[in-house]
């Protein structure tokens, strides 16, 4: 059975249900036995009655958990005195678990009003001792619904309930005036048989449910045009709070299901509907619906080539794992010989990018992991390579489940990980008019220590001199490291014991303020040396502990002009590694592939298509009326981009229909103009409630993983005053 929710109420006849479906564009050429309607008119009365004593949101949030395919009913008990009177008149109705002394008295054929023992037993009697679970006037709406979903009969002492009809336990005379006159549609008289949920292939009802198996909501419904205010209120709340867990279904799919045709699937929601119903379907998906986060990768085989006296010698055979095919195509890499060093001995950008995008190297002779020496000085230095082949082509998902929400990203890399070089390369990559990773969108944890006076590294240096009992930095280095630059374990342990309170008392408080401020300025990529740095600073973004296929300590030694020199940086590197947690690191390539590969895939898909029809933005919307109150010109509404999107036109049109306004933030618009074009002012945003789920954006669209919060100004008027606003997400596209 499938349950289809449509925002309307009709009589509970199959002909009316079919007519209702046809009004939504469904071709319901089916027999009456195939489609039935659950008349939820009584629920509207209950909803109106409940809103007098409960918050609307609580009632609706409870009702959306009702399983409409499960038969259940409330059984309304009379007041205690009337219940005992009914039992006295009908001894056979007395439950078995009633106190035997009370039962014995009730079965006496005499007036009990002056019977002292009976009166004492009646006063001690509690209805809740006999009927459990029992709904009362203090029961929450969610508890009512949970009890309905668990059983078929739920006893209640109040008619202020929601989600099922009310069956009278006794004749109406025993209830006197306790029943609401507005609830007549809900009441089933005593002795009348309760109708069960019809077993049809398709049940049509008014209210969506996240507890009903195979529940679908008719897509394309204009909520604002719903005539019934209570149904409109329900759908507004459901679309705002529960939109991501409800299943939309198109009239086309409903038509095919009713007419027993093979389903013609056009959209992801239709495909999910077919899968939930376990029905075969034709995939009618064009080039517009391609999962751009599925990326083809290969393992690249290459040899380290040494040339001496005109003779070619292969000193090592290596495999570079999980190299994206799109990157190889972009760089024009093929089977050939390459020099991977620049004139100054540094690695070329293309080779550095290729290795960073991979999942490491393996020596084909020893089958062990191989870490490259970044130095150009022997031994074990690589100058020239010969690419000999590509094997093991397969597809990977570069957007795993850990990226559940659109949030900042914290990337933890050890010192000497080429962060500056990689960010310079990424800053230069622009695809479809979008900068992949602007340098302005990157924050380094070193900035926290550099804001101190003295800096964190200077403070550490002076304290360590005292521990070692030396006056100079050179003597400190000699005290910690042996001649092979390997630290003495006991002495490094002493330094680490001093490092912990410094990190806790000096670094962490400053880091909390720093990250609170930086994360309000945008969704930024934050680099740190140890994950403990971010954890102790209450960092709330995605936290990734990463590694690279290079010997980072060697890279530290060839970097000049660093605080304290190369050897002191090496000591700090050891300390940060001790400071990190025991979480297993992933390859840096797992993040870089997510940053670059989907965009290259999308570039192939939309090619030369009109950018106006393939571009969109999701951002915080501020009505111009609110801005004008703070001195802004009001030429247009305020809009602070949160996510920039590139996708085929059909995907953009689908995204336009989603409910973005359910996500909101406290936005501060400043009067500080940002240097550059277009004209804009900086802003801050603190998200309230849930973050934007990644799956809402769609796997068929590319979106920016970082953003800097700025409000664009389309005119040359003077800026207004800085102020805070409550803003909701809005979708902007030239197609709207």
Swiss-Prot record:
InterPro entries: Reovirus_Mu2. Keywords: Capsid protein, Host cytoplasm, Host cytoskeleton, Host-virus interaction, Inhibition of host innate immune response by virus, Inhibition of host interferon signaling pathway by virus, Inhibition of host IRF9 by virus, Interferon antiviral system evasion, Viral immunoevasion, Virion. Its cofactor is a divalent metal cation. GO terms for molecular function: structural molecule activity. GO terms for cellular component: host cell cytoplasm; host cytoskeleton; viral capsid. GO terms for biological process: symbiont-mediated suppression of host JAK-STAT cascade via inhibition of host IRF9 activity; symbiont-mediated suppression of host type I interferon-mediated signaling pathway. It is found in: Virion; Host cytoplasm, Host cytoskeleton. Its main location: virion. Belongs to the orthoreovirus mu-2 protein family. Interacts with protein mu-NS; in viral inclusions. Interacts with polymerase lambda-3; this interaction stimulates the ATPase activity of mu-2. Minor inner capsid (core) component. Displays NTPase and RNA 5'-triphosphatase (RTPase) activities. ATP is the preferred substrate for hydrolysis. May function as a cofactor of polymerase lambda-3. Associates with microtubules and plays a role in the formation, structural organization and morphology of viral inclusions, where the assembly of cores and the replication of viral RNA occur. Together with mu-NS, recruits the other core proteins to these inclusions. This is Microtubule-associated protein mu-2. It comes from Reovirus type 3 (strain Dearing).
């Amino acid at each position: 059975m499938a349950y289809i929710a449509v925002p309307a109420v009709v009589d509970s006849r199959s002909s009316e249900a079919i007519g209702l479906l046809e009004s939504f564009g469904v071709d319901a050429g089916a027999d009456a036995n195939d489609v039935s309607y659950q008349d939820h008119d009584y629920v509207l009365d209950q909803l109106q009655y409940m809103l007098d004593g409960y918050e609307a949101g609580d009632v609706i949030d409870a009702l959306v958990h009702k399983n409409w395919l499960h038969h259940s009913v409330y059984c309304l008990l009379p007041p205690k005195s009337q219940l005992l009177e009914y039992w006295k008149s009908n001894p056979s109705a007395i439950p078995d678990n009633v106190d035997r002394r009370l039962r014995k008295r009730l079965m006496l054929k005499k007036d009990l009003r002056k019977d002292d023992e009976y009166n004492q037993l009646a006063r001690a009697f509690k209805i809740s001792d006999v009927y459990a679970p029992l709904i009362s006037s203090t029961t929450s709406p969610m508890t009512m619904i949970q009890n309905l979903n668990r059983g078929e009969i739920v006893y209640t002492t109040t008619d202020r309930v929601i989600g099922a009809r009310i069956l009278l336990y006794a004749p109406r005379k025993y209830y006197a005036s306790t029943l609401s006159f507005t609830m007549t549609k809900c009441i089933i008289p005593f002795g009348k048989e309760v109708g069960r949920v019809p077993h049809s292939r398709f049940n049509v009802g008014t209210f969506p449910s996240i507890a009903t198996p195979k529940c679908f909501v008719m897509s394309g419904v204009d909520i604002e045009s719903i005539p019934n205010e209570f149904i409109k209120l329900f759908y507004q709340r459901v679309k705002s709070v529960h939109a991501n867990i409800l299943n939309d279904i198109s009239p086309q799919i409903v038509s095919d299901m009713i007419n027993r045709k093979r389903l013609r699937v056009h959209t992801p929601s239709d495909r999910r509907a077919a899968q939930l119903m376990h029905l075969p379907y034709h995939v009618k998906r064009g080039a517009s619906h391609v999962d751009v986060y599925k990326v083809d990768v290969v393992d690249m085989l290459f040899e380290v080539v040494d040339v001496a006296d005109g003779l070619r010698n292969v000193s090592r055979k290596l495999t570079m794992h999980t190299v994206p095919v799109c990157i190889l195509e972009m760089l024009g890499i093929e089977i050939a010989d390459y020099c991977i060093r620049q004139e100054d001995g540094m690695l070329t950008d293309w080779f550095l990018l290729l290795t960073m995008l991979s999942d490491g190297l393996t020596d084909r002779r020893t089958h062990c992991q191989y870490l490259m020496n970044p130095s150009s000085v022997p031994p074990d230095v690589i100058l020239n390579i010969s690419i000999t082949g590509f094997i093991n082509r397969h597809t990977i998902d570069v957007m795993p489940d850990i990226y559940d929400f659109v949030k900042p990203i914290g990337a933890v890399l050890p010192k000497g990980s080429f962060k500056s070089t990689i960010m310079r390369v990424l800053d230069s990559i622009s695809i479809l008019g979008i900068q992949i990773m602007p340098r302005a969108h990157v924050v380094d944890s070193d900035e926290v220590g550099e804001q101190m006076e003295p800096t964190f590294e200077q403070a550490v240096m002076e304290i360590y001199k005292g521990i070692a009992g030396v006056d100079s930095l050179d003597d400190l280095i000699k005290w910690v490291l042996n001649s092979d630059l390997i630290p003495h374990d006991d002495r490094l342990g002493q330094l680490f014991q001093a490092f912990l309170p410094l990190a806790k008392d000096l670094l962490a408080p400053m880091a909390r303020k720093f990250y609170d401020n930086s994360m309000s300025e945008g969704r930024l990529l934050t680099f740190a040396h140890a994950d403990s740095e971010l954890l102790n600073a209450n960092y709330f973004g995605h936290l990734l502990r990463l590694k690279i296929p290079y010997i980072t300590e060697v890279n530290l030694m060839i970097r000049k002009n660093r605080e304290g020199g190369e050897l002191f940086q090496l000591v700090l590197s050891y300390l940060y590694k001790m400071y990190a947690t025991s979480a297993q690191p992933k390859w840096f390539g797992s993040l870089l592939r997510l940053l670059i590969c989907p965009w290259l895939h999308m570039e192939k898909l939309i090619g030369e298509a009109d950018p106006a029809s393939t571009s969109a933005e999701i951002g915080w919307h501020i009505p111009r009326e609110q801005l004008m109150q703070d001195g802004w010109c009001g030429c247009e509404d305020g809009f602070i981009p949160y996510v920039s999107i590139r996708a085929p036109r059909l995907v953009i049109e689908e995204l336009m229909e989603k409910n973005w306004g359910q996500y909101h933030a406290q936005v501060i618009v400043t009067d500080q103009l940002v240097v550059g074009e277009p004209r804009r002012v900086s802003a801050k945003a603190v998200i309230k409630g849930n973050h934007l789920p990644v799956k809402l954006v769609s796997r068929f669209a590319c979106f920016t993983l970082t953003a800097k919060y700025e409000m664009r100004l389309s005119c040359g008027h003077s800026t207004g005053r800085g102020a805070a606003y409550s803003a909701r997400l809005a979708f902007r596209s030239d197609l709207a």
